[in-house]
Amino acid sequence: MRIVTTRRISQVFFFLLFVWFCIVATVGSKFWQLRGWPIEWFFQLDPLVAVGTVLTTHTLYWPLLWALATVVLTLIFGRFFCSWVCPFGSLHHFVGFLGRRSKKLAHKVKLNRYRKAQRVKYYVLVAFLALTAFPSAAATLQVGILDPIAVITRSFNLVLLPIVDSPTSFIFISRRFYEGGWLILVIFLAAVLLNLAIPRFYCRFICPLGALFGIIDRFAIWRIGKKQRECVNCILCERDCEGGCEPAGNIRISECVLCFNCLDSCKHSVIAYQTKTSAAGEVTNPDISRRGFALSLVSGLFGVGAIRLSNRLGSNWYYKVVRPPGSLPEEEFLKRCVKCGQCMRVCPTNVIQPAGFEGGLENLWTPVLNNRIGSSGCQLNCVACGQVCTTSAIRPITLAEKLGVNEFAEAGPIKMGTAFVDRSRCLPWAMDKPCIVCEENCPLSPKAIFTREEFVTLRDGVFTAKKIGGDTIEILEGSLKPAKFAGGDYYCAVDGSARWKITANTETSLTVSADERFRKLAAEISKIEVQVRLQRPYVDIERCIGCGICEHECPVSGKKAIRVSAEGETRSADRKLLLER
Protein backbone atom coordinates (compact mmCIF):
# COMPACT_ATOMS: atom_id res chain seq x y z
CA MET A 1 0.00 0.00 0.00
CA ARG A 2 1.26 3.47 -0.87
CA ILE A 3 2.29 5.61 2.07
CA VAL A 4 -0.09 8.41 1.03
CA THR A 5 -2.97 5.93 0.98
CA THR A 6 -2.13 4.93 4.53
CA ARG A 7 -2.00 8.59 5.50
CA ARG A 8 -5.40 9.26 3.92
CA ILE A 9 -6.91 6.33 5.80
CA SER A 10 -5.47 7.74 9.02
CA GLN A 11 -6.85 11.20 8.25
CA VAL A 12 -10.33 9.88 7.51
CA PHE A 13 -10.30 7.68 10.61
CA PHE A 14 -9.26 10.42 13.03
CA PHE A 15 -11.57 12.98 11.44
CA LEU A 16 -14.56 10.64 11.75
CA LEU A 17 -13.47 9.79 15.29
CA PHE A 18 -13.43 13.49 16.12
CA VAL A 19 -16.92 13.99 14.66
CA TRP A 20 -18.14 10.97 16.60
CA PHE A 21 -16.77 12.40 19.85
CA CYS A 22 -18.63 15.64 19.12
CA ILE A 23 -21.88 13.75 18.52
CA VAL A 24 -21.65 11.52 21.61
CA ALA A 25 -21.10 14.50 23.92
CA THR A 26 -24.83 14.31 24.62
CA VAL A 27 -26.59 13.54 27.89
CA GLY A 28 -29.00 10.66 27.42
CA SER A 29 -29.65 6.96 27.85
CA LYS A 30 -28.81 5.72 24.35
CA PHE A 31 -25.65 3.70 23.75
CA TRP A 32 -23.93 6.55 21.92
CA GLN A 33 -24.73 9.25 24.48
CA LEU A 34 -21.90 10.05 26.88
CA ARG A 35 -21.17 6.50 27.99
CA GLY A 36 -17.47 6.67 28.81
CA TRP A 37 -16.42 7.90 25.38
CA PRO A 38 -13.04 9.71 25.71
CA ILE A 39 -14.34 12.90 24.14
CA GLU A 40 -11.45 14.99 25.55
CA TRP A 41 -8.81 12.76 23.94
CA PHE A 42 -7.80 15.13 21.12
CA PHE A 43 -7.20 17.89 23.67
CA GLN A 44 -5.22 15.50 25.83
CA LEU A 45 -2.95 14.82 22.85
CA ASP A 46 -2.45 18.56 22.29
CA PRO A 47 0.94 19.67 23.74
CA LEU A 48 0.06 23.36 23.34
CA VAL A 49 -2.86 22.98 25.76
CA ALA A 50 -0.63 21.06 28.17
CA VAL A 51 2.21 23.60 28.00
CA GLY A 52 -0.21 26.49 28.34
CA THR A 53 -1.89 25.13 31.47
CA VAL A 54 1.47 24.25 33.03
CA LEU A 55 2.73 27.80 32.50
CA THR A 56 -0.42 29.46 33.85
CA THR A 57 -1.14 27.16 36.80
CA HIS A 58 2.28 25.59 37.46
CA THR A 59 0.46 22.27 37.63
CA LEU A 60 -0.43 19.63 35.06
CA TYR A 61 -3.91 18.14 34.97
CA TRP A 62 -2.95 14.48 34.72
CA PRO A 63 -4.99 13.52 31.60
CA LEU A 64 -2.86 16.04 29.67
CA LEU A 65 0.11 13.70 30.13
CA TRP A 66 -1.09 12.16 26.86
CA ALA A 67 0.51 15.21 25.23
CA LEU A 68 3.90 13.87 26.30
CA ALA A 69 3.34 10.88 24.01
CA THR A 70 2.66 13.27 21.13
CA VAL A 71 5.92 15.12 21.82
CA VAL A 72 7.94 11.90 22.04
CA LEU A 73 6.49 10.57 18.79
CA THR A 74 7.21 13.91 17.11
CA LEU A 75 10.83 13.70 18.27
CA ILE A 76 11.02 10.27 16.65
CA PHE A 77 8.93 10.57 13.49
CA GLY A 78 8.52 14.32 12.86
CA ARG A 79 5.30 16.37 12.55
CA PHE A 80 3.07 13.33 12.14
CA PHE A 81 0.20 14.91 14.11
CA CYS A 82 -0.47 17.62 11.52
CA SER A 83 -1.09 15.29 8.56
CA TRP A 84 -2.05 12.05 10.25
CA VAL A 85 -4.14 12.92 13.32
CA CYS A 86 -5.28 16.56 13.47
CA PRO A 87 -8.92 16.79 12.26
CA PHE A 88 -8.57 20.48 11.43
CA GLY A 89 -5.43 19.75 9.41
CA SER A 90 -7.24 16.99 7.52
CA LEU A 91 -10.06 19.37 6.66
CA HIS A 92 -7.58 21.96 5.38
CA HIS A 93 -5.78 19.26 3.41
CA PHE A 94 -8.98 18.14 1.68
CA VAL A 95 -10.22 21.65 0.82
CA GLY A 96 -6.76 22.63 -0.43
CA PHE A 97 -6.74 19.55 -2.65
CA LEU A 98 -10.09 20.57 -4.14
CA GLY A 99 -8.80 24.06 -4.81
CA ARG A 100 -5.71 23.04 -6.77
CA ARG A 101 -6.57 19.70 -8.38
CA SER A 102 -7.37 21.18 -11.81
CA LYS A 103 -4.37 23.52 -11.92
CA LYS A 104 -1.26 22.98 -13.98
CA LEU A 105 2.03 21.77 -12.53
CA ALA A 106 3.73 25.17 -12.58
CA HIS A 107 0.78 26.78 -10.80
CA LYS A 108 0.70 24.04 -8.17
CA VAL A 109 4.41 24.47 -7.50
CA LYS A 110 3.92 28.23 -7.21
CA LEU A 111 1.09 27.77 -4.72
CA ASN A 112 3.21 25.46 -2.58
CA ARG A 113 6.36 27.55 -2.43
CA TYR A 114 7.64 28.71 0.93
CA ARG A 115 6.61 32.21 1.98
CA LYS A 116 8.30 34.34 4.61
CA ALA A 117 4.89 35.02 6.12
CA GLN A 118 4.93 31.42 7.37
CA ARG A 119 7.04 32.69 10.26
CA VAL A 120 3.95 34.49 11.61
CA LYS A 121 2.72 31.34 13.34
CA TYR A 122 5.88 31.28 15.46
CA TYR A 123 5.26 34.85 16.55
CA VAL A 124 1.68 33.91 17.42
CA LEU A 125 3.00 31.02 19.52
CA VAL A 126 5.51 33.24 21.35
CA ALA A 127 2.83 35.85 22.09
CA PHE A 128 0.43 33.23 23.47
CA LEU A 129 3.12 31.64 25.63
CA ALA A 130 4.13 35.09 26.92
CA LEU A 131 0.51 35.65 27.95
CA THR A 132 0.57 32.41 29.91
CA ALA A 133 3.94 32.83 31.60
CA PHE A 134 4.63 36.47 32.46
CA PRO A 135 3.96 37.49 35.12
CA SER A 136 2.58 34.38 36.74
CA ALA A 137 0.18 36.30 38.99
CA ALA A 138 -1.55 37.83 35.96
CA ALA A 139 -1.13 34.99 33.47
CA THR A 140 -4.05 34.08 31.24
CA LEU A 141 -4.61 31.09 28.97
CA GLN A 142 -5.62 32.33 25.52
CA VAL A 143 -4.22 29.55 23.32
CA GLY A 144 -7.77 28.27 22.79
CA ILE A 145 -8.51 31.21 20.50
CA LEU A 146 -6.31 29.78 17.71
CA ASP A 147 -5.36 26.26 18.83
CA PRO A 148 -6.59 24.03 15.97
CA ILE A 149 -8.24 21.43 18.20
CA ALA A 150 -10.07 24.16 20.13
CA VAL A 151 -11.10 25.96 16.94
CA ILE A 152 -12.57 22.92 15.22
CA THR A 153 -14.19 21.59 18.41
CA ARG A 154 -15.81 24.95 19.11
CA SER A 155 -16.95 25.28 15.50
CA PHE A 156 -18.44 21.79 15.28
CA ASN A 157 -20.09 21.80 18.70
CA LEU A 158 -21.54 25.30 18.69
CA VAL A 159 -22.25 25.96 15.01
CA LEU A 160 -22.03 23.09 12.53
CA LEU A 161 -23.78 20.32 14.48
CA PRO A 162 -26.69 22.57 15.58
CA ILE A 163 -27.17 23.74 11.98
CA VAL A 164 -27.02 20.23 10.49
CA ASP A 165 -29.24 18.71 13.19
CA SER A 166 -31.91 21.43 13.24
CA PRO A 167 -34.13 19.81 10.52
CA THR A 168 -34.00 16.30 12.04
CA SER A 169 -33.41 16.71 15.81
CA PHE A 170 -31.55 13.39 15.77
CA ILE A 171 -28.75 14.52 18.09
CA PHE A 172 -30.55 17.19 20.10
CA ILE A 173 -34.02 16.84 21.58
CA SER A 174 -34.76 20.47 20.81
CA ARG A 175 -33.08 23.03 18.61
CA ARG A 176 -29.84 24.44 20.04
CA PHE A 177 -28.89 28.10 20.12
CA TYR A 178 -25.55 29.73 20.87
CA GLU A 179 -24.89 33.43 21.27
CA GLY A 180 -22.19 34.81 18.99
CA GLY A 181 -22.23 31.68 16.86
CA TRP A 182 -21.97 33.83 13.75
CA LEU A 183 -18.46 34.98 14.74
CA ILE A 184 -17.32 31.41 15.34
CA LEU A 185 -18.76 30.41 11.96
CA VAL A 186 -17.12 33.33 10.12
CA ILE A 187 -13.69 32.49 11.57
CA PHE A 188 -14.12 28.80 10.76
CA LEU A 189 -15.25 29.42 7.18
CA ALA A 190 -12.47 31.95 6.61
CA ALA A 191 -9.85 29.48 7.85
CA VAL A 192 -11.23 26.68 5.66
CA LEU A 193 -11.94 28.66 2.48
CA LEU A 194 -8.51 30.32 2.45
CA ASN A 195 -7.20 26.88 1.50
CA LEU A 196 -8.65 27.49 -1.96
CA ALA A 197 -6.11 30.28 -2.37
CA ILE A 198 -3.13 28.72 -0.58
CA PRO A 199 -3.15 25.06 0.52
CA ARG A 200 -3.19 24.63 4.31
CA PHE A 201 -3.27 28.40 4.79
CA TYR A 202 -4.12 28.13 8.49
CA CYS A 203 -1.47 25.48 9.12
CA ARG A 204 1.25 27.44 7.35
CA PHE A 205 0.61 30.97 8.60
CA ILE A 206 -1.46 30.93 11.80
CA CYS A 207 -1.50 27.63 13.71
CA PRO A 208 0.37 27.98 17.03
CA LEU A 209 0.30 24.22 17.59
CA GLY A 210 1.96 23.71 14.21
CA ALA A 211 4.60 26.24 15.25
CA LEU A 212 5.27 24.26 18.43
CA PHE A 213 5.60 21.07 16.40
CA GLY A 214 7.92 22.91 14.01
CA ILE A 215 10.25 23.77 16.88
CA ILE A 216 10.21 20.18 18.15
CA ASP A 217 10.58 18.76 14.64
CA ARG A 218 14.10 20.13 14.18
CA PHE A 219 15.23 17.45 16.66
CA ALA A 220 13.31 14.59 15.00
CA ILE A 221 15.18 11.37 14.27
CA TRP A 222 13.26 10.46 11.11
CA ARG A 223 12.76 13.10 8.44
CA ILE A 224 12.09 13.67 4.76
CA GLY A 225 15.14 14.39 2.61
CA LYS A 226 17.13 13.55 -0.48
CA LYS A 227 19.24 10.42 -0.62
CA GLN A 228 21.58 12.08 -3.12
CA ARG A 229 22.23 15.60 -4.27
CA GLU A 230 21.91 14.80 -7.97
CA CYS A 231 18.36 15.28 -9.22
CA VAL A 232 16.63 15.80 -12.57
CA ASN A 233 14.82 18.83 -11.09
CA CYS A 234 11.42 17.72 -12.28
CA ILE A 235 9.97 19.52 -9.19
CA LEU A 236 7.17 16.94 -8.95
CA CYS A 237 8.02 16.69 -5.26
CA GLU A 238 6.85 20.29 -4.74
CA ARG A 239 3.62 19.85 -6.69
CA ASP A 240 1.57 18.73 -3.68
CA CYS A 241 3.79 19.74 -0.76
CA GLU A 242 1.38 20.55 2.09
CA GLY A 243 3.78 22.52 4.25
CA GLY A 244 5.69 24.51 1.65
CA CYS A 245 8.94 23.01 2.90
CA GLU A 246 10.72 23.02 -0.53
CA PRO A 247 11.86 19.37 -0.66
CA ALA A 248 13.50 19.88 -4.09
CA GLY A 249 16.23 22.03 -2.52
CA ASN A 250 17.30 22.72 1.03
CA ILE A 251 14.29 21.25 2.78
CA ARG A 252 12.83 23.27 5.65
CA ILE A 253 12.44 20.62 8.32
CA SER A 254 10.30 22.73 10.63
CA GLU A 255 7.70 23.27 7.87
CA CYS A 256 7.40 19.63 6.78
CA VAL A 257 4.03 18.25 7.94
CA LEU A 258 4.93 14.69 6.93
CA CYS A 259 2.27 14.34 4.24
CA PHE A 260 4.65 12.13 2.16
CA ASN A 261 3.31 13.60 -1.09
CA CYS A 262 6.86 14.39 -2.19
CA LEU A 263 8.04 10.84 -1.57
CA ASP A 264 5.06 9.45 -3.48
CA SER A 265 5.54 11.87 -6.39
CA CYS A 266 9.27 11.30 -6.89
CA LYS A 267 9.69 9.04 -9.94
CA HIS A 268 13.40 8.55 -9.40
CA SER A 269 13.36 7.52 -5.73
CA VAL A 270 15.56 10.45 -4.75
CA ILE A 271 13.24 11.53 -1.92
CA ALA A 272 13.29 9.28 1.13
CA TYR A 273 12.11 9.11 4.72
CA GLN A 274 15.36 8.55 6.56
CA THR A 275 17.35 9.11 9.73
CA LYS A 276 20.20 10.99 8.08
CA THR A 277 20.17 14.58 6.90
CA SER A 278 19.12 15.46 3.38
CA ALA A 279 21.93 15.19 0.84
CA ALA A 280 20.82 18.50 -0.68
CA GLY A 281 21.02 20.28 2.67
CA GLU A 282 18.51 21.26 5.33
CA VAL A 283 17.16 24.36 7.01
CA THR A 284 16.51 23.06 10.51
CA ASN A 285 15.69 26.21 12.46
CA PRO A 286 12.36 28.01 12.08
CA ASP A 287 12.63 31.12 9.93
CA ILE A 288 12.18 33.75 12.63
CA SER A 289 14.13 36.92 13.26
CA ARG A 290 15.33 38.24 16.61
CA ARG A 291 13.36 41.42 16.04
CA GLY A 292 10.18 39.49 15.32
CA PHE A 293 10.70 37.23 18.32
CA ALA A 294 11.28 40.21 20.61
CA LEU A 295 8.27 42.05 19.22
CA SER A 296 5.95 39.07 19.72
CA LEU A 297 7.33 38.50 23.22
CA VAL A 298 6.79 42.13 24.18
CA SER A 299 3.32 42.02 22.61
CA GLY A 300 2.43 39.07 24.81
CA LEU A 301 3.78 40.78 27.91
CA PHE A 302 1.92 44.00 27.17
CA GLY A 303 -1.13 41.98 26.24
CA VAL A 304 -1.42 40.68 29.80
CA GLY A 305 -1.71 44.23 31.08
CA ALA A 306 -3.90 45.39 28.22
CA ILE A 307 -6.62 42.79 28.69
CA ARG A 308 -6.66 43.46 32.43
CA LEU A 309 -6.99 47.26 32.14
CA SER A 310 -10.72 47.08 32.80
CA ASN A 311 -10.06 45.37 36.17
CA ARG A 312 -12.57 42.62 35.44
CA LEU A 313 -10.89 40.40 38.04
CA GLY A 314 -11.05 43.13 40.69
CA SER A 315 -13.72 45.49 41.93
CA ASN A 316 -15.04 46.01 38.38
CA TRP A 317 -15.93 42.36 37.90
CA TYR A 318 -18.86 41.78 35.54
CA TYR A 319 -21.93 40.62 37.44
CA LYS A 320 -23.47 38.87 34.42
CA VAL A 321 -20.60 36.38 34.15
CA VAL A 322 -22.27 33.47 35.94
CA ARG A 323 -20.12 30.35 35.60
CA PRO A 324 -21.32 26.71 35.54
CA PRO A 325 -21.37 24.78 38.83
CA GLY A 326 -17.94 23.56 39.87
CA SER A 327 -16.05 26.37 38.13
CA LEU A 328 -12.80 27.42 39.77
CA PRO A 329 -12.35 30.97 41.11
CA GLU A 330 -12.33 33.41 38.19
CA GLU A 331 -8.58 34.06 38.02
CA GLU A 332 -7.80 30.34 38.20
CA PHE A 333 -10.64 29.58 35.78
CA LEU A 334 -9.16 31.88 33.12
CA LYS A 335 -5.79 30.16 33.56
CA ARG A 336 -7.33 26.83 32.55
CA CYS A 337 -10.25 27.34 30.18
CA VAL A 338 -9.33 26.67 26.52
CA LYS A 339 -12.68 27.90 25.13
CA CYS A 340 -13.42 24.55 23.49
CA GLY A 341 -17.19 24.59 24.02
CA GLN A 342 -17.41 21.01 25.30
CA CYS A 343 -19.35 22.07 28.40
CA MET A 344 -21.77 24.09 26.26
CA ARG A 345 -22.26 21.15 23.93
CA VAL A 346 -23.02 18.66 26.70
CA CYS A 347 -25.39 20.92 28.66
CA PRO A 348 -28.83 19.27 28.32
CA THR A 349 -30.77 22.52 28.75
CA ASN A 350 -28.57 24.67 26.46
CA VAL A 351 -28.15 27.22 29.27
CA ILE A 352 -24.32 27.31 29.05
CA GLN A 353 -23.33 29.80 26.37
CA PRO A 354 -20.09 31.20 24.90
CA ALA A 355 -19.34 34.59 26.42
CA GLY A 356 -18.86 37.64 24.23
CA PHE A 357 -16.62 40.64 24.76
CA GLU A 358 -18.79 42.15 27.49
CA GLY A 359 -16.78 40.51 30.27
CA GLY A 360 -13.43 41.49 28.78
CA LEU A 361 -11.31 40.10 25.95
CA GLU A 362 -10.01 37.13 27.92
CA ASN A 363 -13.61 36.17 28.69
CA LEU A 364 -14.37 35.59 24.99
CA TRP A 365 -15.93 32.15 24.29
CA THR A 366 -15.62 31.01 27.90
CA PRO A 367 -18.74 29.35 29.36
CA VAL A 368 -21.37 31.50 31.06
CA LEU A 369 -24.98 30.84 31.99
CA ASN A 370 -27.62 32.63 29.93
CA ASN A 371 -30.95 31.72 31.44
CA ARG A 372 -32.95 33.25 28.59
CA ILE A 373 -31.74 30.65 26.07
CA GLY A 374 -32.54 26.97 25.99
CA SER A 375 -35.18 24.88 27.68
CA SER A 376 -34.49 25.76 31.31
CA GLY A 377 -31.89 26.99 33.76
CA CYS A 378 -29.21 24.80 35.35
CA GLN A 379 -30.90 21.57 36.43
CA LEU A 380 -30.30 20.39 40.00
CA ASN A 381 -29.63 16.80 38.96
CA CYS A 382 -27.01 17.59 36.30
CA VAL A 383 -23.22 17.84 36.65
CA ALA A 384 -22.31 16.95 33.06
CA CYS A 385 -20.29 20.09 32.29
CA GLY A 386 -17.58 19.29 34.83
CA GLN A 387 -17.26 15.73 33.56
CA VAL A 388 -16.18 16.82 30.06
CA CYS A 389 -13.92 19.78 30.90
CA THR A 390 -10.49 19.09 29.42
CA THR A 391 -8.42 21.16 31.82
CA SER A 392 -10.62 21.04 34.95
CA ALA A 393 -11.50 24.72 34.71
CA ILE A 394 -14.88 23.29 35.71
CA ARG A 395 -14.20 20.70 38.38
CA PRO A 396 -15.83 17.28 38.04
CA ILE A 397 -18.28 17.38 40.94
CA THR A 398 -20.87 14.96 42.28
CA LEU A 399 -24.56 15.63 42.76
CA ALA A 400 -23.99 15.45 46.51
CA GLU A 401 -21.44 18.27 46.34
CA LYS A 402 -23.62 20.37 44.05
CA LEU A 403 -26.66 20.02 46.31
CA GLY A 404 -24.71 20.20 49.58
CA VAL A 405 -25.93 16.91 51.02
CA ASN A 406 -24.34 13.92 52.77
CA GLU A 407 -20.65 14.63 53.37
CA PHE A 408 -21.06 18.13 51.89
CA ALA A 409 -23.94 19.13 54.16
CA GLU A 410 -21.75 21.39 56.30
CA ALA A 411 -20.34 23.24 53.27
CA GLY A 412 -23.78 23.64 51.75
CA PRO A 413 -24.79 23.65 48.07
CA ILE A 414 -22.71 25.19 45.32
CA LYS A 415 -24.03 28.68 44.59
CA MET A 416 -23.55 29.95 41.04
CA GLY A 417 -25.03 33.32 41.91
CA THR A 418 -28.15 34.89 43.36
CA ALA A 419 -31.53 35.82 41.90
CA PHE A 420 -32.73 39.41 42.31
CA VAL A 421 -36.32 40.60 41.84
CA ASP A 422 -36.60 43.74 39.73
CA ARG A 423 -39.63 45.38 41.30
CA SER A 424 -39.86 47.89 38.48
CA ARG A 425 -40.69 45.06 36.05
CA CYS A 426 -42.25 42.38 38.23
CA LEU A 427 -45.96 41.96 37.50
CA PRO A 428 -47.15 41.81 41.13
CA TRP A 429 -44.83 44.60 42.23
CA ALA A 430 -44.98 47.08 39.36
CA MET A 431 -48.32 46.40 37.68
CA ASP A 432 -50.55 44.86 40.35
CA LYS A 433 -50.99 41.72 38.25
CA PRO A 434 -51.12 38.26 39.87
CA CYS A 435 -48.09 36.08 39.11
CA ILE A 436 -46.21 33.43 41.09
CA VAL A 437 -44.32 31.76 38.23
CA CYS A 438 -40.87 32.25 39.76
CA GLU A 439 -41.94 30.83 43.11
CA GLU A 440 -43.72 27.88 41.50
CA ASN A 441 -40.68 26.93 39.41
CA CYS A 442 -38.02 27.27 42.11
CA PRO A 443 -36.71 23.68 42.34
CA LEU A 444 -35.34 23.91 45.87
CA SER A 445 -37.01 22.53 48.97
CA PRO A 446 -37.67 24.63 50.97
CA LYS A 447 -37.97 27.11 48.14
CA ALA A 448 -35.54 30.01 47.83
CA ILE A 449 -38.36 32.21 46.50
CA PHE A 450 -41.30 32.89 48.78
CA THR A 451 -44.26 35.26 48.55
CA ARG A 452 -46.11 37.61 50.86
CA GLU A 453 -49.81 38.14 50.32
CA GLU A 454 -51.17 41.64 49.87
CA PHE A 455 -54.57 42.97 48.79
CA VAL A 456 -54.46 46.05 46.58
CA THR A 457 -57.43 48.08 45.36
CA LEU A 458 -57.43 48.37 41.58
CA ARG A 459 -57.10 51.70 39.88
CA ASP A 460 -60.68 52.83 39.15
CA GLY A 461 -61.75 49.90 41.30
CA VAL A 462 -64.24 51.71 43.57
CA PHE A 463 -67.90 51.21 42.58
CA THR A 464 -71.34 52.17 43.86
CA ALA A 465 -73.63 49.27 44.75
CA LYS A 466 -76.94 49.71 42.93
CA LYS A 467 -78.65 46.53 44.06
CA ILE A 468 -77.65 43.41 45.95
CA GLY A 469 -79.52 40.18 45.51
CA GLY A 470 -78.28 36.87 46.83
CA ASP A 471 -74.60 36.67 45.84
CA THR A 472 -74.81 39.24 43.02
CA ILE A 473 -73.98 42.92 43.28
CA GLU A 474 -75.26 45.23 40.57
CA ILE A 475 -73.16 48.36 40.19
CA LEU A 476 -74.13 51.80 39.09
CA GLU A 477 -71.10 52.20 36.81
CA GLY A 478 -71.66 49.71 34.02
CA SER A 479 -68.19 49.55 32.49
CA LEU A 480 -66.73 46.18 33.46
CA LYS A 481 -65.19 43.76 31.00
CA PRO A 482 -67.12 40.47 31.21
CA ALA A 483 -65.28 37.68 33.10
CA LYS A 484 -62.33 39.99 33.79
CA PHE A 485 -62.39 39.31 37.53
CA ALA A 486 -63.35 35.63 37.42
CA GLY A 487 -59.81 34.24 37.69
CA GLY A 488 -59.86 33.67 41.44
CA ASP A 489 -57.45 36.45 42.42
CA TYR A 490 -60.00 39.27 42.63
CA TYR A 491 -62.10 40.16 45.65
CA CYS A 492 -64.95 42.46 46.51
CA ALA A 493 -64.04 44.45 49.63
CA VAL A 494 -66.20 46.52 51.96
CA ASP A 495 -64.61 49.03 54.32
CA GLY A 496 -61.19 47.71 53.30
CA SER A 497 -61.38 44.65 55.58
CA ALA A 498 -64.30 42.37 54.74
CA ARG A 499 -63.60 40.54 51.46
CA TRP A 500 -65.40 38.04 49.30
CA LYS A 501 -63.89 36.31 46.28
CA ILE A 502 -65.35 37.34 42.92
CA THR A 503 -66.43 34.26 40.97
CA ALA A 504 -67.95 35.95 37.89
CA ASN A 505 -68.82 39.32 36.48
CA THR A 506 -70.75 40.97 33.68
CA GLU A 507 -70.58 44.54 32.45
CA THR A 508 -72.84 45.71 35.29
CA SER A 509 -72.59 43.10 38.04
CA LEU A 510 -70.25 41.11 40.26
CA THR A 511 -70.93 37.62 41.59
CA VAL A 512 -69.16 36.76 44.85
CA SER A 513 -68.78 33.68 47.01
CA ALA A 514 -71.25 34.97 49.55
CA ASP A 515 -71.41 33.79 53.15
CA GLU A 516 -73.64 34.57 56.11
CA ARG A 517 -71.70 37.71 56.94
CA PHE A 518 -72.18 39.04 53.41
CA ARG A 519 -75.92 38.51 53.61
CA LYS A 520 -76.12 40.34 56.93
CA LEU A 521 -74.19 43.33 55.58
CA ALA A 522 -75.91 43.41 52.19
CA ALA A 523 -78.43 46.04 53.18
CA GLU A 524 -75.68 48.36 54.47
CA ILE A 525 -73.31 48.10 51.49
CA SER A 526 -73.16 51.23 49.36
CA LYS A 527 -69.57 51.38 48.16
CA ILE A 528 -67.44 48.40 47.17
CA GLU A 529 -63.80 48.05 46.18
CA VAL A 530 -62.46 45.52 43.71
CA GLN A 531 -59.13 44.28 45.08
CA VAL A 532 -56.55 41.93 43.65
CA ARG A 533 -54.76 39.41 45.78
CA LEU A 534 -51.05 39.70 45.03
CA GLN A 535 -48.37 37.23 46.07
CA ARG A 536 -45.28 39.40 45.80
CA PRO A 537 -42.03 37.43 45.47
CA TYR A 538 -38.98 37.69 47.71
CA VAL A 539 -35.65 35.86 47.42
CA ASP A 540 -34.05 34.12 50.38
CA ILE A 541 -30.42 34.80 49.50
CA GLU A 542 -29.19 32.18 51.94
CA ARG A 543 -31.06 29.46 50.03
CA CYS A 544 -30.82 30.68 46.43
CA ILE A 545 -28.14 28.89 44.40
CA GLY A 546 -28.51 30.90 41.19
CA CYS A 547 -29.76 28.03 39.02
CA GLY A 548 -31.68 30.53 36.88
CA ILE A 549 -34.82 28.46 36.39
CA CYS A 550 -36.89 31.33 37.80
CA GLU A 551 -35.34 33.74 35.31
CA HIS A 552 -35.95 31.38 32.40
CA GLU A 553 -39.62 30.89 33.31
CA CYS A 554 -40.39 34.54 34.11
CA PRO A 555 -43.26 35.61 31.80
CA VAL A 556 -41.89 39.14 31.40
CA SER A 557 -40.28 39.09 27.98
CA GLY A 558 -37.32 41.24 27.10
CA LYS A 559 -35.52 42.14 30.31
CA LYS A 560 -36.69 39.58 32.84
CA ALA A 561 -38.26 40.68 36.11
CA ILE A 562 -36.10 38.27 38.10
CA ARG A 563 -32.49 37.88 37.07
CA VAL A 564 -29.48 35.93 38.32
CA SER A 565 -26.12 37.62 38.77
CA ALA A 566 -22.86 36.29 40.16
CA GLU A 567 -23.16 37.91 43.58
CA GLY A 568 -22.99 35.34 46.32
CA GLU A 569 -21.25 32.63 44.28
CA THR A 570 -19.40 30.18 46.50
CA ARG A 571 -16.31 30.02 44.29
CA SER A 572 -15.34 33.63 45.08
CA ALA A 573 -14.95 34.77 48.67
CA ASP A 574 -14.95 38.44 47.66
CA ARG A 575 -18.39 38.23 46.02
CA LYS A 576 -20.40 37.24 49.06
CA LEU A 577 -23.53 39.20 49.88
CA LEU A 578 -23.51 38.62 53.63
CA LEU A 579 -20.79 38.70 56.26
CA GLU A 580 -20.20 35.28 57.77
CA ARG A 581 -20.60 34.99 61.51
Tell me what each language-model feature is.
Residues M1-R581:
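Non-ligating segments of multi-cofactor redox enzymes
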